[in-house]
Design a protein with these regions (language model features):
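Hydrophobic-ligand binding "helix-grip"
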Residues: 31-32, 38-41, 54-101, 109-111, ...
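Flexible "cap/lid" loop of the alpha/beta hydrolase fold
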Residues: 116, 258, 262-263, 268-301
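Conserved alpha/beta-hydrolase catalytic His-Asp/Glu region
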Residues: 282-289, 301-358
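Conserved loop-alpha-helix segment in the C-terminal half of the alpha/beta-hydrolase fold
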Residues: 361-404, 415
Length: 429
């Protein structure tokens, strides 16, 4: 099979936000060639548009594979309708113009047998040009910023303890549906997730877990491994009677969530990764050891997490973090027992595998803070792009949380929760 890429670039006098408000409506009828269009969802909740073109009876179907409101990019793949196309993947990016207005870049990568490839590419070029022209010439809606939707009423929560080895403590809601389980970072606790827990509980059952050794959970008798964390997730799933899970992680919690997804992809209805994903699984042995030793030095000197919490907060917090946010981050860090912090650190710096993203069969949402020093937008965007490339049928969303540092759900809880709820609402029950 031969491959070819078609690309069309244009400009619009409208702002990038105004153009994106049109383009991001994946099932909107803004393209002049479209006669009819409607939205469908596949079994995983992925968005599919089914449409016909003027003068044709063929029904075309395309699945949204990538969406980023913060980057103003989307990608899609052809499912049916184009005769002879082995594969067909499109991408649209809206950027700021050099002298105001917007730049519009639309491309499609086509794979087909050589005799048919040229005809598909010629037809594609005409379609892309017509779409770019429509976006360039049409007077788009006002550039006024769209008002965010209000968050739903908070769901009631309760604390429970799962007895066993080790004891696990969590806060949960009593809603129905898959279980949305929140996993905190190395310097956090389940309390970091309370705003998201209450919001998610209005969509499905939700729970925030204290990882072993944190908060109300007990530390195991021997050094923890990522397998132990995955077993703890299975215990929570069984205790709460959940058929499927949506894992939501932050930093260390993101690495644990991805590790679980590698082992049990069939159990996950969705995967949400914030401020991390690969952990130290792609770092060299020297890099991992340097990281571990540098963070063990204060512990070996007899300090506790409470002693070095102020220095940690300076790294975690964004430049505009409020005093209240900094105080919350400090309290979370200061409450961690030294043995727990050491245990988590050793586990985190001894990953057992490098992730195979082709195993991620579920919808994935990735987020990070604009000012995250530990998991920068460029890094997390890059990982999301690799998942897009390697997953067999990707359904990926990536967002940068404005004006947030590493613990983006704590610094910008409303912005984080809105994106999370958009993701949860699309998942099948």
């Amino acid at each position: 099979m031969a491959r070819e890429t078609v690309e069309v670039v244009g400009v619009s006098p409208a702002s990038p936000e105004a153009v994106w408000s049109v383009v991001s409506d994946f099932c909107g009828q803004w393209h002049p060639a479209i006669a009819t269009i409607h939205a469908e969802r596949d079994a995983r909740g992925a968005l599919v548009r089914a449409f016909t073109a003027h003068g044709e009876s063929t029904v075309y179907r395309e699945q949204l594979t990538w969406l980023s409101d913060s980057d103003r990019t989307l990608a899609y793949t052809h499912l049916e309708g184009i005769a002879g196309a082995q594969s067909y993947d499109g991408r649209i990016a809206i950027g700021a113009g050099d002298h105001g207005g917007s730049t519009l870049r639309w491309s499609a990568r086509v794979e087909a047998a050589s005799p048919r490839l040229q005809a598909i590419c010629e037809g594609t070029k005409a379609i892309l040009e017509a779409g770019i022209a429509a976006l360039s010439e049409t007077t788009l809606a006002t550039d006024a910023a769209e008002q965010p939707r209000p968050l739903p009423a908070s769901a009631a929560t309760r604390d429970i303890v799962i007895d066993g080895e080790p004891r696990l403590a969590l806060t949960t809601t009593d809603s129905d549906g898959p279980l949305c389980l929140f996993l905190h970072g190395i310097g956090g606790s389940r309390g970091n997730w309370l705003p998201q827990l209450a919001a998610a509980g209005g969509v499905m059952r939700a729970a925030a877990l204290d990882l072993r050794g944190y908060g109300g959970s007990a530390l195991g008798r021997i050094q923890s491994t990522v397998e132990d964390y995955c077993d703890d997730i299975l215990r929570v799933k069984e205790e709460l009677g959940a058929d499927r899970l949506v894992l939501v992680g932050l930093s260390l919690g993101s690495w644990i969530a991805t590790s679980f997804a590698m082992r049990h992809p069939e159990m996950l209805a969705g995967l949400v990764l914030s401020g991390g994903c690969t952990g130290m699984s792609e770092a060299s042995l020297e890099e991992r050891e340097t990281f571990r030793v540098s963070r063990k030095v204060p512990l070996d000197a007899g300090q506790t997490p409470a002693d070095f919490a102020p220095a940690v907060v300076k790294v975690l917090a964004g430049p505009n973090a409020s005093d209240a946010v900094k105080e919350q981050l400090f309290r979370s860090m200061a409450a961690i027992p030294s043995a727990t912090y050491r245990d988590s650190l050793v586990c985190f710096t001894n990953p057992s595998e490098r992730f195979d993203f082709s195993r991620l069969t579920m919808p994935v949402l990735m987020m990070t803070g604009e000012h995250d020093r530990l998991a920068s937008p460029s890094e997390i965007r890059g990982v999301a792009g690799r998942i897009l490339d390697q997953a067999s049928r990707p359904d990926i969303r990536y967002e940068t949380i404005p004006d947030a540092g590493h613990v983006c759900n704590v610094e910008q809880p409303a912005a984080y929760s809105r994106i999370l709820l958009d993701f949860l609402r699309k998942l099948p029950r």
